[in-house]
Regions:
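Conserved polymerase palm-domain catalytic core
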Residues: 144-243, 247-264, 282, 330, ...
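Right-hand nucleic-acid polymerase module
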Residues: 1-9, 13-14, 102, 107, ...
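Non-catalytic, polymerase-adjacent accessory regions of viral genome-replication enzymes
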Residues: 1-69, 378-379
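Conserved pre-motif C helix in the palm subdomain of viral-like polymerases
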Residues: 96-127, 205-232
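Short Gly/Ser/Thr- and Asp/Glu-enriched loop/turn motifs at secondary-structure junctions
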Residues: 85, 240-244, 277
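Reverse-transcriptase-like RNA-dependent polymerase core
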Residues: 71-95, 108, 115, 189-203
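Active-site-proximal segment of RNA-dependent polymerases
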Residues: 30, 114-173
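Conserved phosphate/pyrophosphate-binding and hydrolysis machinery centered on Walker-type P-loop NTPases
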Residues: 57, 61, 136, 208, ...
């Protein structure tokens, strides 16, 4: 056996091993399991959380088993279960977002597709530092990973370093459907399950919609190849991504610039454009913003995590609006107290001593002191 034959034999052995592992990952996560009435029934009880007060959800739940059986039969006979979208706009942190929500009958199917099919198979291929839309992860997880990366960098190099912060322009609206399908085909063996998932993607002429669980999960896995390339080819262990936001901690500014050029080129291949007004290279000692928090690495190695100024201003304004609605009798005082406790609870996890004092003072001025003044005046 010559060298070429040995290489070919080794390749075939490794390919067979990968195919076997792929087959094992897909066991129990097939089209038949996803579309079974029992899976759909469990998906309904999970999907109704937080929205059980809606009349449409209650109507579906009255005959949940009958509805699940009918839906299962329709899917297996190749019928289209889509009833169109419920479209509306919301304002999130001053940014207008267009939401495309689906009816409860379709949401149940999406829940089953995600929980019983896509997520158990595809999440195993994600890097650990991909923190969005996964059980046990989230914004707090992403912030803690950043702090851990900064501590690791400091122990090795001190504060002499830079961080590349990246942000994408119109991320959901730029996603290529062919790449989404290619990513699923790499991990999922059941073609019928892939076709079912694509039924929730294809109605969008371009990109993916906000408000769909399937679209949310597929967006998380969209740049998975780039994530692995940064971690394994570039050997950047201090890299993390949260949906369309990412960071890389680098030794030098030139290294960060080289990575930025790679991201611009690679993201362009995926149809995504980096928002260069928000993408920046910052010296670690200068402080930077990550997921709405202002982060500082001090010369002692201590990390200061302060809430972003924009979120503080936004919540102060919201508290003032709530106070006006309480005065007009539109909402009870308990609503204001709930918002105040929630905001203080968030700030208590930050280095925000003065911010907490300012919120306390504002709440007292809006509610407590004014109430006491009126009690004295009318006594």
């Amino acid at each position: 056996m010559n060298s070429k034959e040995r290489h070919e034999a080794r390749y075939l052995r490794r390919k067979a091993k990968r195919d076997l592992a792929k087959q094992k990952r897909n066991e129990g996560h097939t089209f038949d399991v996803v579309t079974s009435p029992e899976s759909l029934r469990r998906a309904f009880y999970s999907a109704r959380k937080g929205v059980n007060w809606k009349a449409s959800v209650q109507r579906y739940g009255v005959n949940v088993l009958r509805n699940c059986i009918d839906t299962s039969e329709k899917i297996r006979h190749g019928e289209n279960i889509s009833k169109g979208f419920i479209e509306f706009d919301i304002s999130e942190r001053g940014k207008k977002r267009h939401i495309t929500s689906v009816h409860i009958s379709e949401r149940v199917v999406q829940k089953s597709v995600c929980d019983n099919g896509i997520v158990p198979v595809m999440e195993k291929s994600l890097i650990y530092d991909n923190g969005a839309s996964q059980k046990g992860k989230g914004t707090d997880f992403a912030r803690e990973r950043l702090k851990k990366h900064l501590h690791q960098f400091y122990r090795k190099y001190g504060t002499d370093g830079y961080i590349l912060l990246g942000d994408c322009h119109d991320f959901f609206g730029s996603i290529d459907h062919s790449i989404v399908k290619r990513n699923m085909e790499k991990m999922i063996t059941d073609q019928r399950l892939i076709d079912l998932a694509m039924q929730f993607v294809d109605p969008f002429p371009r990109g993916l919609g906000l408000g769909s669980q399937v679209c949310q999960i597929l967006a998380v896995t969209y740049q998975n190849e780039i994530d692995h390339c940064i971690k394994e080819v570039w050997r950047k262990k201090w890299y993390a991504r949260y949906m369309d936001d990412f960071y890389v901690i680098c030794r030098t500014k030139d290294e960060a610039k080289e990575l930025l050029a790679y991201f611009i080129e690679k993201y362009r291949e995926y149809g995504i454009e980096l928002n260069l007004s928000k993408t920046q290279i910052v010296k670690l000692t200068h402080g930077f913003v990550w997921l709405q928090d202002r982060i500082y690495l001090l010369p002692t190695g201590r990390i200061v995590d302060k809430p972003g100024r924009s979120s503080l201003v936004r919540n102060r304004r919201k508290l003032k609006k709530i106070a006006k609605r309480v005065d007009r009798g539109e909402i009870p005082f308990n609503n204001a107290l709930t918002f105040y406790n929630s905001h203080i609870g968030y700030l208590s996890h930050k280095d925000a001593y003065h911010a907490i004092k300012n919120v306390d003072k504002l709440f007292n001025d809006l509610f407590i002191r004014r109430f006491m003044y009126e009690q004295v005046r009318y006594a």
